[in-house]
Amino acid sequence: MPLPNNYEYAGSSDPNHGNKYRMLSNEQKDLLALALTYGYPNRVGLQTSKDANACYAATQLIVWQITLGFRTSPTELNDKSYPVSGYSGTMTEQHCRNKYFKAYYDAILADMASHYIRPSFAVNYAGAAPVYEMEYANGKYTLTLTDANGILSKYYVSQSSGVSVSVSGNTLTLTSSKPINDAVTIKLNRQIPVTTMSTGFLIWSVPGKEGANQDMVSGVPGENDPVPSFLKVRTAAGLSLIHI
């Protein structure tokens, strides 16, 4: 994705001297990471060249909005760009008149906005995880939890602590053949999209010729936050059975 030429280089013989990315705030870097995570070419389901082109252009615009300081969150934008000669509206308004572009633009921003939403029954810290009780029935201990936030389908189980755990839509089902007297931790992580074109995070520039070239950014930052989410389970008190 091209980065706008709104930052100056300090000038150095060191090929790693570019400071455009370094000059971004931490908030901008976080937003940029999300845009690249859910945008082109990391976005899953690009079936045609029309899809790829629209997704590429939408990702590029969002990157520009972030690095120019126009976008402060997935839902907050103050586009201060001027209309191109012969056209009306801001840079964002002009691009969003194309329905194919707008579809991917909206989808990328929606995924960015929901990235840090956790299932309603889980929290972000294991030490504060709520404890749920599994009930005994039909020879096993079970528990079913429904996610009121509607985001569970975008998570996977990364730690089960010996409990059988499955995700189906917005329903989490936990099963154990043995009693669990001391609560154990269940950990869920956000699914990060990956395609055959996904790469590591890179900033591209031409050292010594920065003024005549536009910097590029590609790939997905390796420190992408999987949004770990925690809950704990145990078997209901008084229901521990002696197996002979």
Which residue ranges define each predicted feature?
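Short, surface-exposed polybasic-aromatic patches that bind anionic ligands, especially phosphate groups
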Residues: 1-116
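Long amphipathic N-terminal alpha/beta scaffold segment
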Residues: 119-125
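Solvent-exposed, low-complexity, repeat-rich "mucin-like" stalks and linkers
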Residues: 125-151
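Extracellular/luminal low-complexity segments enriched in Ser/Thr/Pro
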Residues: 170-185
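Short, aromatic- and glycine-rich surface loops/edge beta-strands on solvent-exposed regions
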Residues: 181-206
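Long, compositionally biased, intrinsically disordered
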Residues: 218-229, 235
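Conserved small/polar residues in nucleotide/adenosyl-binding loops
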Residues: 242-244
